[in-house]
């Protein structure tokens, strides 16, 4: 059995999870749901920087080579310390020796994969999906790494029978197991930006043709 493919998220999706009861962050290309961590340590003042960062990318907190929190030489002690200008947070030791510091927590939360829910897209793009049966159009922001089948899963919110359609671009059926780029749907955002052309005026259109098989999902 092939391994389950991780889910990709857009920064916009991550940003929607920014409250105490539902708090996500992204860092170093991964997306994490820290809600269980907040519940476990409810009321701990060291959660404040984490809560303040809810829904955002915090890659700047970490060293991309080690995956650990950035360090610096403390000017007062001359010792190597974690660098936390946003404020000391959970599982970060105090700057000075402290008898009340409990370091028996095992793996620090930022190294615990139990909180990981997916991968942050390195590049998102907009596409227009046109239902030729109903003439309805839907603009979707998708991840460039997603296959057409995964994009279909996003579109189910607008059409529960999306799998009953043949998906085409410029009249050619799309390979549902390939990405947009692999299907020849080029991402020209960079070229448009260099030419100062509004990319929204040239959003790729995917046309759906009904197969009349009444697929139930």
UniProtKB/Swiss-Prot annotation:
Primary location class: cytoplasm
One of the GO biological process terms: regulation of cilium beat frequency
A GO term, aspect molecular function: metal ion binding
Keyword Metal-binding appears in the UniProt entry: yes
Superkingdom: Eukaryota
UniProt keywords, alphabetically: Cell projection, Cytoplasm, Cytoskeleton, Heme, Iron, Metal-binding
Alphabetized PROSITE patterns for the sequence: CYTOCHROME_B5_2 (PS50255)
Stored Pfam families: Cyt-b5 (PF00173)
Its job: Radial spoke stalk protein that binds heme under oxidizing conditions. Required for the coordinated beating of multiple cilia maybe by functioning in a redox signaling pathway.
This protein's name: Cytochrome b5 domain-containing protein 1
């Amino acid at each position: 059995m092939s391994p389950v493919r991780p889910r990709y998220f857009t920064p916009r999706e991550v940003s929607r999870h920014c409250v105490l009861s539902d708090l996500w962050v992204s860092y170093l290309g991964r997306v994490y749901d820290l809600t269980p961590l907040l519940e476990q340590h409810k009321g701990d003042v060291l959660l404040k920087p984490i809560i303040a960062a809810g829904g955002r990318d915090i890659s700047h907190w970490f060293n991309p080579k080690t995956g650990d929190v950035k360090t610096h030489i403390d000017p007062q002690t001359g010792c190597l310390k974690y660098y936390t200008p946003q404020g000391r947070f959970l599982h970060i030791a105090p700057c000075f020796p402290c008898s009340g510091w409990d370091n028996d927590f095992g793996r620090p939360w930022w190294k615990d994969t139990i909180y990981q829910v997916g991968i942050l897209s390195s590049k998102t793009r907009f596409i227009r999906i046109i239902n030729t049966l109903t003439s309805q159009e839907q603009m979707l922001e998708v991840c460039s790494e997603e296959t057409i089948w995964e994009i279909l899963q996003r579109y189910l919110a607008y059409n529960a029978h999306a799998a009953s359609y043949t998906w085409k671009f410029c009249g050619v059926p799309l390979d549902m197991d390939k990405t947009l780029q692999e299907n020849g749907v080029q991402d020209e955002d960079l070229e448009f930006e260099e030419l100062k052309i509004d990319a929204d005026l040239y959003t790729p259109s995917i046309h759906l043709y009904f197969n009349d098989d009444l697929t139930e999902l």
